[in-house]
A protein has these predicted regions:
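Bacterial N-terminal signal peptides
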Residues: 10-18
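Residue-level marker of intrinsically disordered, low-complexity segments enriched
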Residues: 7, 19-21, 121
Length: 153
């Protein structure tokens, strides 16, 4: 019962956030659609973000390349057509990120924290996933996100 009420409250705030927030990065705003997401952490807290959606192959190849500042409570959600092991890199990405690998049910599968800017090192999901969420470095520690937590959109 408490968990159900917690989820309803989180969804209410997600709706409120989506209706009120606007992002300042015109370039990303023009190239990507936006959506609000809510992260429900195991510590019973809800965190709200507005993310750009990388849905097409070209958008996924571009990602957050050349972005020099990621505003607080923003990020990018990569949406793939199917679940499989995914590989990411940081080529031409000037800021360190936390990468969250998410399965088809919205459950956090694994997290790669504090990625190295502009690195060509491959960062792979540990299991088949359908989504990757990129947030500013340190965000996952700040919201106490762990494997098994749930992300809603």
């Amino acid at each position: 019962m408490i968990r159900k009420n917690h989820s309803l409250i989180c969804l209410f705030f997600l709706t409120l956030l989506y209706s009120c927030i606007s992002l300042g990065s015109d370039e990303l705003d023009n190239a990507f659609k936006q959506r609000s997401i809510m992260i429900s952490s195991s510590n019973q807290s809800c965190s709200h973000f507005v993310v750009w959606l990388a849905e097409t192959r070209n958008q996924q190849m571009r990602g957050l390349m050349y972005v020099k500042n990621l505003p607080q409570n923003t990020g990018m959600l990569f949406i793939y057509p199917d679940s499989k092991i995914r590989a990411m890199w940081m080529k031409n990405t000037y800021i360190s990120l936390d990468m969250i690998f998410i399965d088809e049910n919205g459950i956090v599968s694994s997290i790669e924290k504090n990625t190295e800017p502009q690195s060509l090192k491959t960062i792979r999901s540990e299991k088949p996933i359908k989504y990757v969420l990129e947030l500013a470095e340190g965000t996952t520690d700040q919201i106490k996100l762990i494997e098994g937590d749930h992300i809603y959109w």
